[in-house]
């Protein structure tokens, strides 16, 4: 029986495409929430509560594997903030950890509760995950490596900043990462 994995893709992402498709190719049963369709229509707080409920119902164990990408990681981190320490392994790729903007593209984003993660973590109120790896590109203006690194330090997560990479980490890098992380 294949091992199950919980996956949250980035904004507008599907669990059956991209990384989700690669996880299926590797023999995993992929569960999670797509950030499109009915789930996207839910109130933000309900989205976060739904993810927390999913984790508690089916993935609250030491051998659980959870992967989240970009905005999906933001939803996951907020869901985990309302729970006790997650017992499984977490892999975050280019996570959004708060607001961001880019002067060159004149694009910015302020997610709901943009400061909550840092506020909880800096006060020691964020439940420290048992195992959390974070990977972000050095040129990622959405995840902002300095912000990711600062948050990771507060929650005892291992962070890797991939030199020269942007928000979409190279497929070869992610494939190699999965080779070691999924063991």
Predicted segments with their positions:
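Short beta-strand/loop motif that positions the catalytic acidic residue
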Residues: 128-129, 133-136, 140, 148
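Active-site catalytic motif of lipid deacylating hydrolases and related acyltransferases
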Residues: 2-60
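Short glycine-rich catalytic loops that host catalytic nucleophiles or stabilize transition states
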Residues: 33-36, 160-166
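Conserved alpha/beta-hydrolase "acid-adjacent" motif
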Residues: 16-17, 141-147, 170
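Gly/Ala-rich beta-loop-alpha elbow adjacent to hydrolase catalytic centers
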Residues: 67-77
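Active-site nucleophile loop of the alpha/beta-hydrolase fold
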Residues: 35-38, 91-100
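Catalytic histidine-centered segment of alpha/beta-hydrolase-like enzymes
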Residues: 41-42, 165-175
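Conserved alpha/beta-hydrolase fold motif
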Residues: 66-67, 90
């Amino acid at each position: 029986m294949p091992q199950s994995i919980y996956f949250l893709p980035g904004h507008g992402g599907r669990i059956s495409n991209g990384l989700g498709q690669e996880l299926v190719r590797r023999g995993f049963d992929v569960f999670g929430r797509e950030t499109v369709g009915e789930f996207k229509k839910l109130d933000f707080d309900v989205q976060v509560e739904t993810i927390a409920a999913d984790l508690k119902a089916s993935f609250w164990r030491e051998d659980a594997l959870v992967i989240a990408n970009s905005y999906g990681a933001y939803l996951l981190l907020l869901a985990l903030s309302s729970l006790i320490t997650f017992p499984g392994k977490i892999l975050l790729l280019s996570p959004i950890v708060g607001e961001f903007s880019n002067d060159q593209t004149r694009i910015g984003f302020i997610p709901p509760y943009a400061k909550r993660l840092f506020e909880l973590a800096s006060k020691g109120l964020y439940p420290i995950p048992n195992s959390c790896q974070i990977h972000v590109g050095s040129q990622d203006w959405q995840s902002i490596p300095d912000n990711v690194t600062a948050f990771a330090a507060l929650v005892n997560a291992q962070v890797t900043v991939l030199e020269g990479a942007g928000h979409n980490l190279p497929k070869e890098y992610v494939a190699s990462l999965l080779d070691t992380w999924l063991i």
